[in-house]
Amino acid sequence: MANIEKQAGELQEKLIAVNRVSKTVKGGRIMSFTALTVVGDGNGRVGFGYGKAREVPAAIQKAMEKARRNMINVALHEGTLQHPVKGIHTGSRVFMQPASEGTGIIAGGAMRAVLEVAGVRNVLSKAYGSTNPINVVRATIDALANMKSPEMVAAKRGKTVDEILG
């Protein structure tokens, strides 16, 4: 699970999973390792990376580099989400909704790590279907990327924020 946390400048890095995989060839098995990591600035930017190498440290390093390259911006509202969102990736489905101050991050495993590094402080969430960490992380990132702020909606509709919010 999310067991390594480092500060790289202003970025928080979390290691979610390390897995040993093998390729069978004529001469036997070739072992290698995969690593799944998330990186965020704690203020609405988050990304994930998946690295594979013959040694664990090299796999983690590759995953961190990919995570830094694949960051997205998330429109947060006072440390929580703008509105309830759903995300899907293959067999994993996630549902997240805003929570009041003091609730904390109610999420399991891989989803919790993504929300923590993104800077979300209060959220209620649930993962349905497959709980494979890679798919849950991708579904969570999908849900966060699809979340729209009232300013974004107002700009798209050509209205003011007050008209959108009623």
Curated annotation (Swiss-Prot):
Residues 11-74 form the S5 DRBM domain. Pfam families: Ribosomal_S5, Ribosomal_S5_C. Keywords: Ribonucleoprotein, Ribosomal protein, RNA-binding, rRNA-binding. GO terms for cellular component: small ribosomal subunit. Belongs to the universal ribosomal protein uS5 family. This is Small ribosomal subunit protein uS5. One of its GO terms (molecular function) is rRNA binding. InterPro entries: Ribosomal_Su5_D2-typ_SF, Ribosomal_uS5, Ribosomal_uS5_bac-type, Ribosomal_uS5_C, Ribosomal_uS5_N, Ribosomal_uS5_N_CS, Ribsml_uS5_D2-typ_fold_subgr. Part of the 30S ribosomal subunit. Contacts proteins S4 and S8. The N-terminal domain interacts with the head of the 30S subunit; the C-terminal domain interacts with the body and contacts protein S4. The interaction surface between S4 and S5 is involved in control of translational fidelity. With S4 and S12 plays an important role in translational accuracy. It comes from Mannheimia succiniciproducens (strain KCTC 0769BP / MBEL55E). One of its GO terms (biological process) is translation.
